[in-house]
A protein has these predicted regions:
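Formylglycine-dependent sulfatase
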Residues: 2-449, 457-478, 482, 492, ...
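Short, charged, surface-exposed hinge/linker loops at domain edges
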Residues: 493-506
Length: 555
């Protein structure tokens, strides 16, 4: 395909929406304002696509996610733009690839106000807009030039502490998502359509270690991905993660019940997904499947035929155009995403649009995890069953530097959230039989990685240097560069420093005394000296723990 701009090669899908109208389904563009649907966008934090009961995961129960999927459409191939919270969410809100958003391309940075977001557009067209939990985050809203979170007006005042019944004490976010949603609904005027963003903090780390076992889960039911060592501690850690997914599902159920009680369920376009993959080594903050492949279920009363599975490759940049089209609002030309209405309005399962066989993902700076906060830029193209990853700076550590001092949390490899599974993989460094797990997660990678997704579901067999796949690699790389160039990737313009110079507002480890950037900047010299000493003490504590982990592995 010589021209792979998604805006160009996906325009043909609009004709499929017309076909849906001919079959008796109302096209969103023909809607009158008074018939505009409500929009409920539910997004979890760090949930990989395979972990739901409808996908066959025996160790987790997600009846409410399954309910949405069965009532509507399950998307088998949905991808985030970036496997990192803030840039993934920015791409959803703006309908653009993260690399198009300048400072919005990174974690703990900014999201410039010049970029339009769909909640603001809908609000201008009469929608009641708000969010609870985690909206666009983490980053600095004020320095972005915004007066509020781009997800809408905040509804986080109502708190809850029912966790003891769930088996934890204080590891979960204490916002009552459903109660705040109800408060949001009470604020709207009459039958005003609403657009609400429900962002759960779960299943983001940290977890209450052993939660899954305390809830009666059996470690034997866990399917340990091949890129992780199969140890009791890893199995227990995965159970804890799955338990938090169940907590998310419970909150989803409460919100669905609220809609049903108010008679709004059938007039609400409901989307359930996650921002990026599970917080484990070689998953989150990576462009492999477990980092970018997301759960996605969408239902909309009787407007769409339910019980279907769609194979089209879709990207999070497609959400904003979908919501705007559903509301009968013109989609801004600068949005790179394409509406999912043809897929939703179709009566069929499987591949709806044959041209939706390609998608793109990226990574820039995730955590402060290399000297000076340097990024580990990556770009990828998934086309049909092949995934090509381009590591633009292969000399840099892909998961953060191995030296703890250079990382935000003063642990090695700071792009990987710390927890039991990370410690288990760190311990593999000195075990000859298990060293592969360490290398897969942390070691430097070649410039190109090529994987056959169907034959290699965990992306462990790099085909990039295999002569048999040379033409495949070259074709994919050509398509990738064409798309990056057409969509204004600053790396293709020699301006990658824009992504790297953005302030990192979280702690920069020793550089900010273990404090968040603005907090550190407000200290006097004496206070900074104390912060530096506290950070050095924390570093020593981490180094001692790291020594214990590695020594135990050597024995």
């Amino acid at each position: 395909m010589s021209d792979i701009s998604r805006r160009n090669f996906l325009k043909t899908t609009l004709g499929m929406g017309a076909a849906a109208v001919a079959s008796g389904v109302l096209n969103a563009k023909d809607r009158k304002p008074e018939s505009a649907p409500n929009i409920l966008f539910c997004i979890a934090d760090d949930w990989t696509w395979v972990h739901s009961s409808i996908e066959g995961c025996e160790a987790v129960e997600t009846p409410n996610f399954d309910r949405v999927a069965k009532k509507g459409v399950m998307f088998n191939n949905a991808y985030c733009s970036a496997p990192s919270c803030a840039p993934s969410r920015a791409s959803i809100l703006a309908g653009r690839n993260g690399w198009e958003l300048e400072e919005g391309a990174v974690l703990w940075g900014q999201f410039p106000a010049k970029y339009k977001v769909y909640p603001e557009i809908l609000e201008q067209h009469g929608y009641h807009v708000g969010y609870t939990g985690k909206g666009w985050s983490p980053g600095d809203i004020e320095d972005s030039g915004r007066t509020r979170n781009p997800a809408g007006k905040e509804y986080n005042e109502i708190r809850q502490r029912p966790w003891t019944e769930f088996g934890v004490t204080d590891e979960m976010f204490d916002v009552d998502y459903a109660a705040n949603f109800d408060a949001f609904l009470k604020d709207r005027k009459g039958d005003q359509p609403f657009c609400f963003w429900l962002g759960t903090i779960e299943p983001h780390r940290a977890y209450a270690e052993g939660l899954g076992k305390r809830r009666g889960k059996d470690p034997k039911d866990v399917n340990v991905p091949d890129f992780l060592p199969d140890t009791p501690r890893v199995r227990s850690d995965i159970l804890d993660y799955l338990s938090e997914i169940e907590w998310v599902d419970i909150q989803l159920g409460r919100v669905l019940d609220t809609l049903e009680q108010k008679g709004e369920l059938d007039n609400t376009l409901i989307v359930v997904t996650s921002d990026n993959g599970m917080p484990f080594p070689r998953a989150k903050a990576n462009l492999y499947e477990y980092g970018t492949h997301m759960p996605l279920a969408i239902c909309w009363g009787n407007e769409i035929k339910g019980g279907r599975r769609v194979d089209d490759l879709v990207n999070f940049i497609d959400f904003a155009p979908t919501f705007l089209e559903a509301a009968g609002v013109e989609v801004p030309e600068e949005m790179s995403g394409q509406s999912l209405m043809p897929q939703l309005l179709s009566k069929r399962s499987g591949q709806i649009d044959p041209q939706r066989n390609v998608t793109f993902t990226y990574k820039e700076r995730h955590a402060w995890s290399n000297p000076g906060g340097l990024a580990t830029p990556m770009r990828s193209i998934r086309k049909d069953n092949f995934l090509l990853i381009w590591n633009l700076r292969p000399e840099r550590w892909p998961a953060g530097h191995e030296v703890p001092e250079f990382n935000w949390d003063m642990w090695p490899f700071g792009d990987v959230d710390h927890g039991p599974s990370k410690e288990e993989v760190l311990a593999c460094k000195y075990d000859e039989k298990k060293r592969k797990y360490y290398d897969w997660a942390f070691s430097k990678r070649p410039e190109f990685e090529l994987y056959d997704i169907a034959a290699d579901p965990y992306q462990l067999n790099n085909l990039a240097r295999d002569p048999k796949y040379k033409k495949q690699r070259e074709s994919l790389f050509r398509n990738l560069k064409q798309y990056l160039t057409k969509t204004g990737d600053l790396r293709m313009q020699g301006r990658g420093e824009v992504y790297e110079r953005t302030p990192y507002y979280c702690t920069q480890g020793l550089e900010t005394g273990g404090l968040w950037l603005k907090e550190f900047q407000g200290l006097n010299r004496k206070e900074r000296e104390k912060a530096y000493q506290d950070a050095r003490d924390q570093l020593e504590e981490n180094l001692q723990k790291l020594h214990e982990i590695t020594e135990e592995a050597r024995e």
